[in-house]
Every structure is written in structure tokens, then in C-alpha cells.
């Protein structure tokens, strides 16, 4: 199975080439030329498998230049007990009769990004070998909070790799910033960027398409790749947990085979919910995909009107990982729903770059609305949902998961749709102690890492080990840069 760019499908790439390159040189995103279907009886077969076995089975359908043995080894290492604090890896928790929560934050950095970023280093280093690449890969990452730490943790001290992470200077939580600032490893770098996440992400994308930078780094023995969800190696491992969740529902007798289930996903860059769409296209019985946004509700408006318009105020919210106005992975959906019309997609992306907006056709809008439902949650609604979940279900959730639960509640009220629904829980509540304590009406709050102990006491839940040990770690990275200087930061890092 070959891969092509969303903006020019005339060139074909192997899976290893697509993963190693990360972003196509025309600025487009790689995706497979076709979507493999789940074989007959596959869901039933997978109910008896471990998470690692499911990952091997599903990923092998997309990665034909990797052996089953290789993928099996990668899955055992990526999702092993030394990395995840539960054998289930991504456990499904029942909230009430029709609602389940897919906990995706049991990995080493306590966010769903671990599900892909523990796997990506194995996929990337194996891809380099398959491509007979002798240069060192430098991974550039723009983060709205969680990706940065998960990528740093995944790639620290991995041979033939260096990783540089950029995050918005005042746009991540204190715990997220501390996680990155204390990162260990000899091959890692971290810098804040003055501006918001979109500034950091646009800066990184600009570096990828900078020919003179590519030549300069090649002479020094480096080439650039990405660990953001623009890399197919990030999207693919995420498909696994949607299929795995359905298999768990089958195993528990909560659904019968073929019964449709809705998924509600907190959404920023559109990568997580895109993986759910791929699972649906593979044949997973999914009814609706609920796209849950915060006050930066550019996607809610897009799904409703077909107009994508980032010309709007940018809000720093209590769910910072979704504070995004340019949702990169939407480009892959547009390519899929247009039947692979690369010129159309390239045109939309040029309009977005030049004017900040584009309008899809009525036909495309209807296709989007046949699967996706958009909704958003205000700051007050997000906080109220955290309190409500604690009061009614004794279940502590983070701010991003709260956005999804609120959107689900609104959707059910408006439509009466009582289809069983799985909410993707994307981060541990302990990553956002400040906002969660506010939601629980705690007025006299601690500061720094003492917030972790305070939330543990108030909630009766222990802080996850990777966060509880932060207070003992040394701060290594404190620098910041203007977005115009990101190129200099990278060249300096690679001296």
C-alpha cells in the first residue's frame, strides 16, 4: 500500500518513506491511497486479544513494508507495563448505562498523546533503516501542551535522533510547562515561543518547507521530520484505540456485533477524531462522531456552515491543548471526502494561508454532516461539567474531557439520540490541577507541584506517578524565542 500527499498525489511513497519524511515537501500531509477494510470476523477475533496484539493486527493492515513480527515487538515495547500503569493500556470505564469513558492517559506523560508517541519512535527508527537513511533525524514539534512532553519522552536518548519542541509561552498549564522544562535526555531541546499555538505550528511548518534550511542541515548530516499529528505515524496508532474500545464493549456484552456506537472526541488539531473516522471507514460500526471544541470553536462553525474561518479572536482557555484555530488534520478529511481531489485541497489550503478562510461545496458540507456533529463548551460549562461528574458519578475528569461530556449532553438534549457513546478522555485531571480545583470550588489553592497533593486530597485519587515525581526534578529549559527566530533556534540546537 502506497502513500500520497493531500496536495499532489502524483508521487507515491512507501509507508516507511511517509513516516520518515513526516510532512510532504509540497506542504501536504501523507495518507494511504486506500483505506483497508477490517476482515470478516476481525472484531470478534480481537475481543480475545491484548491491546498490544490488537495494535499489531490493525497497524499491519496499513504498513505493508513492516513485518508482523516487527510490529508485534514494537507494540510490546511501546505499551508495556514499564510505560503504562494498567495492563488494559486504554481502559474503558462505564459512566452510566449508555455512556463509557475511554481513558487514554495511563502512559508516561498522562495524556492521550502517549498512545501514539510511545509507538512512533519504533516506527520512525525502523523506517530510517528501511530507507537506508544514514543521516540523523531532527524531529521538530509544535505543542499546545501534551504533544511536546509525550514526544520528548518517546524520543529521549533514541539513537540517531534529536528532538526540538516549541510551545506557546503563556499557552500551557503550569504542570505541562514543568513536564517539558525538566525533560531528561541528551538529545532533547525545548523553547517557548512568543505567541499562541498556531504561531508555533505555522513556524514549524515553515521550517519544513524551507529548502535552504534543508540543504544546510543535510550538509551537517541531519534531516527534518515531525512528531506532530501531521505525521501519519501519529494518526495510525490512534486508530487502534477506537477499534479496541469497541472490542471491549463486545467483550463486556455492552453491545452486540454490528451495533453502532457514537464517539465524542475533544478536538483541537483534528488528528484524534480523524483516527476515529478512519476506524469508521475500515468498517467499525460508528454512528456519529461528535467533535467537541472549547471557545476556540472554529470546527463547530465549519461543520455547521462549511466555512472554515480562523479570522476570529483567539482564547486562552482552561483546556489549552484545544486552543487552536488552524486544525491541520482537517486537510486529510477534505482529501478523503473529495475523492482524492489534490488540486481542490491545495486550493483550500492556499486560501487558508492567504485569507484565513475557505468555503467547501454544499455537497462536501453534507458529507461532513452525515458523520460529524459539532459542539462547543464555554469555560463556565466546562467547569460545571467537572463538578457535575464528581457529584453524580464520583468520577474526576480533566478540562478537555469535560468539554466532550458537555457537548455530548447538549447533543442528546437536542436530538434525543440515545445511541451508546464512548467519550475519549484525553488527559489526567492532574495535568490541569488549577482549573479542576476551581471547578471543585476550592478557593484556597496551593501553588506549584503542591497542587498535585491538594487535588489528590480533595478528590481521594492519587496523582499519577510521573506527575507526583515532578517536584524532585531539575529544571533544564527556560529559554524563549520570537517566532521569527525559530530557524536560528533549530540551527543552533544542531551545532
What are these regions (language model features)?
Residues 1-495:
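PLP-dependent amino-acid enzyme catalytic core
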Amino acid at each position: 500500500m502506497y502513500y500520497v500527499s493531500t496536495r499532489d498525489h502524483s508521487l507515491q511513497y512507501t509507508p516507511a518513506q511517509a513516516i520518515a519524511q513526516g510532512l510532504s515537501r509540497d506542504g501536504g500531509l501523507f495518507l494511504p491511497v486506500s483505506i483497508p477494510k477490517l476482515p470478516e470476523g476481525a472484531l470478534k477475533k480481537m475481543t480475545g486479544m491484548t491491546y498490544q496484539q490488537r495494535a499489531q493486527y490493525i497497524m499491519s493492515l496499513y504498513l505493508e513494508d513492516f513485518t508482523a513480527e516487527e510490529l508485534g515487538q514494537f507494540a510490546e515495547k511501546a505499551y508495556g507495563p514499564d510505560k503504562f500503569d494498567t495492563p488494559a493500556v486504554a481502559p474503558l470505564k462505564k459512566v452510566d448505562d449508555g455512556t463509557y469513558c475511554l481513558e487514554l492517559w495511563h502512559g508516561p506523560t498522562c495524556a492521550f498523546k502517549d498512545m501514539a508517541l510511545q509507538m512512533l519512535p519504533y516506527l520512525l527508527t525502523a523506517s530510517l533503516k528501511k530507507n537506508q537513511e544514514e543521516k540523523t533525524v531532527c524531529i521538530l514539534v509544535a505543542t499546545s501542551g501534551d504533544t511536546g512532553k509525550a514526544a520528548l519522552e518517546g524520543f529521549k536518548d533514541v539513537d540517531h535522533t534529536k528532538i526540538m519542541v516549541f510551545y506557546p509561552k503563556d499557552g500551557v498549564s503550569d504542570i505541562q510547562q514543568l513536564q517539558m522544562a525538566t525533560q531528561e535526555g541528551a538529545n532533547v531541546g525545548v523553547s517557548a515561543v512568543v505567541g499562541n499555538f498556531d504561531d508555533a505550528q505555522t513556524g514549524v511548518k515553515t521550517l519544513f518547507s524551507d529548502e535552504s534550511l534543508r540543504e544546510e542541515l543535510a550538509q551537517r548530516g541531519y534531516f527534518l521530520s515531525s512528531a506532530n499529528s501531521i505525521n501519519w505515524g501519529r494518526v495510525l496508532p490512534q486508530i487502534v484505540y477506537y477499534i479496541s474500545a469497541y472490542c471491549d464493549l463486545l467483550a463486556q456484552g455492552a453491545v452486540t456485533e454490528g451495533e453502532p456506537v457514537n464517539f465524542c472526541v475533544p478536538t483541537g488539531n483534528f488528528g484524534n477524531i480523524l483516527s476515529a473516522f478512519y476506524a469508521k471507514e475500515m468498517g467499525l460500526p460508528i454512528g456519529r462522531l461528535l467533535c467537541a471544541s472549547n471557545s476556540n470553536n472554529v470546527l463547530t462553525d465549519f461543520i455547521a456552515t462549511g466555512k472554515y474561518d480562523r479570522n476570529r479572536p483567539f482564547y486562552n482557555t482552561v483546556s489549552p491543548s484545544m486552543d487552536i484555530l488552524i486544525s491541520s488534520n482537517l486537510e486529510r478529511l477534505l482529501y478523503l471526502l473529495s475523492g482524492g481531489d489534490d488540486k481542490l485541497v491545495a486550493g483550500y489550503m492556499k486560501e487558508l494561508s492567504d485569507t484565513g478562510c475557505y468555503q467547501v461545496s454544499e455537497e462536501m458540507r453534507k458529507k461532513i454532516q452525515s458523520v460529524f456533529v459539532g459542539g462547543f463548551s464555554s469555560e463556565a460549562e466546562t467547569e460545571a461539567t467537572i463538578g457535575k461528574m464528581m457529584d453524580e458519578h464520583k468520577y474526576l475528569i480533566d478540562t478537555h474531557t469535560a468539554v466532550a461530556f458537555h457537548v455530548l449532553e447538549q447533543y442528546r438534549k437536542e436530538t434525543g439520540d440515545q445511541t451508546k457513546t464512548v467519550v475519549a478522555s484525553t488527559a489526567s485531571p492532574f495535568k490541569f490541577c488549577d482549573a479542576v480545583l476551581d471547578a471543585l470550588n476550592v478557593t484556597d489553592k496551593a501553588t506549584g507541584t503542591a497542587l498535585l497533593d491538594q487535588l489528590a486530597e480533595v478528590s481521594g485519587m492519587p496523582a499519577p506517578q510521573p506527575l507526583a515525581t515532578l517536584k524532585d526534578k531539575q529544571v533544564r529549559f527556560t529559554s524563549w524565542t520570537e517566532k521569527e527566530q525559530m530557524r536560528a533556534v533549530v540551527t543552533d540546537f544542531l551545532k
